[in-house]
Amino acid sequence: MIIDTTAVQDMNSFSRLQSLKEVSGIIWMLVPILSLVLGITLGVLVIVWLEREISAGIQQRIGPEYAGPMGILQALADGIKLIFKENLLPSRGDTRLFSIGPSIAVISILLSYSVIPFSSHLVLSDLNIGVFLWIAVSSIAPIGLLMSGYGSNNKYSFLGGLRAAAQSISYEIPLTLCLLSISLLSNSSSTVDIVEAQSKYGLWGWNLWRQPIGFLVFLISSLAECERLPFDLPEAEEELVAGYQTEYSGIKFGLFYVASYLNLLVSSLFVTVLYLGGWNISISYIFVPGLFEITKVGRVFGTTIGIFTTLAKTYLFLFISITTRWTLPRLRMDQLLNLGWKFLLPISLGNLLLTTSSQLLSL
């Protein structure tokens, strides 16, 4: 049997072309994901530096100044130090739960970034249930903290994990009710649709003015979800040494801090998206909607402006969160639970009923 060499070469060339197409498709799929991860990492480093500088200013002392200009590389130096430190395991603890707990906390929060629109053309996944995906995946993080506390075989760690679970349950319900109110106003649960619904009326179309009660409840609940002062009961130093982090060292110890700042950043981004108009500058006389959609260069320029606008609003909320941490005292556990169940839950439920009534009357 004689085989035509030309046909064989054509088949080999076709198979190589198909392989190259598959590889290029995988690369193009990974590029936005890796870009998002890189941007999030830089955002966390900036937040750590900002917190140290702001806390130094509030306490009238000198902040980080040796690692890089103005100490901006101090967080990177701390991360490298933790990578090379020894990872200790508790002798009588559950090593599997102990090891997997920090990873669950970080991964569950990272998934939330997939539905955040940084601009009209920069969102990893525009889902119809975007805001509720955030609630769903963020509720997994306390499970990781509880696993870490239980696997440590330490009473302080276990108590810290229990507090994290109780705090998460108490404040996720008001948070969800606020999200329902926003979804009713926007007639959608997609984060992109919510931002576009606010852009119709400029600055006065922000949900901040239409939902002031919901904004305050969302603000307090998001701070409690991030376990920031005055809501850092799961890791109260005076009572629980370091809570669920007590037995951790090395990179696993660093993962908890990364998860904390990731959660703070994603909460700030959702405040921007849900209440502050997202990527819209909201100056209708200067920036006409659709102005940057005419050419490719215009779309790139508009996307860049949208990213900077989103980040500016986000870091404004971050400044408020950091200032709150260094100015307010910690609540007791009973005060924390009473605030969530006796005050925020009825207020958020009443806000949802008012929103529903107004939407029905407007039909």
UniProtKB/Swiss-Prot annotation:
Catalysed reaction equations from the record: a plastoquinone + NADH + (n+1) H(+)(in) = a plastoquinol + NAD(+) + n H(+)(out); a plastoquinone + NADPH + (n+1) H(+)(in) = a plastoquinol + NADP(+) + n H(+)(out)
GO biological process annotation, one example: photosynthesis, light reaction
Pfam families xrefs: NADHdh
UniProt enzyme class: translocase
GO molecular function, one term: quinone binding
InterPro entries (UniProt xref): NADH_UbQ_OxRdtase_su1/FPO, NADH_UbQ_OxRdtase_su1_CS
Family listed: Belongs to the complex I subunit 1 family.
Role: NDH shuttles electrons from NAD(P)H:plastoquinone, via FMN and iron-sulfur (Fe-S) centers, to quinones in the photosynthetic chain and possibly in a chloroplast respiratory chain. The immediate electron acceptor for the enzyme in this species is believed to be plastoquinone. Couples the redox reaction to proton translocation, and thus conserves the redox energy in a proton gradient.
Entry-linked PANTHER family: NADH DEHYDROGENASE SUBUNIT 1, NADH-UBIQUINONE OXIDOREDUCTASE CHAIN 1
Name of the protein in question: NAD(P)H-quinone oxidoreductase subunit 1, chloroplastic
